[in-house]
Amino acid sequence: MIQIEWNEKKLNSFYNKMDKIAVNVKKGSLEGIKKATEETQKLALQLKRGSNKGILIELLDTSTNKIKGRVYTDSKNFPYLVYLEFGTGIYADPEGGGSRAKRIPWYVHVSMADLSRYGYPVYTSPFTGEKFYVVAGAHPHPYMRPAGFKMRDKNIEIIRTAIQEMIKEAVKWYTN
């Protein structure tokens, strides 16, 4: 016959610690994702040309046991950022959805900007007589995709470390 004895107080303490671990894993995940998105945002801002604005962070709904973070461009206040990332006209990156852009030049009305100093040809509409500069477009200067790829491994490590720290906190009693 096998006889088993246990200390009810220690068993209850163990159950409480396990509950604390479950809570801390979610908390650690959230902290890790928050830090990872902040680090990705910081790198994207370093890679982006121009002002250090227009790149936002959002932590998505955590009530579904799925924690998600995203770094994205503020297209409402900075609508040109997609063109900076993917380019325009014949230089457009196909990943940006610009498959037609390889065949279509851009037309800029002469009243919008004086581009004569750049030597762009001028097209006169046979229908309206209006004049347009014919421009090829702008080369892409990606910043979001490189930041995401460069931060991929580091983000995994940031999240892993945050979860490990929360678990260590929950099981401190065990290591003492």
Label every PLM stretch briefly.
Residues M1-F78, A92-N176:
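Short, Lys/Arg-rich flexible segments
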Residues F78-E85:
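Mid-chain, well-packed structural core segment of small domains
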Residues G89:
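Short, His- and charge-rich active-site/binding loops that engage polyanionic ligands
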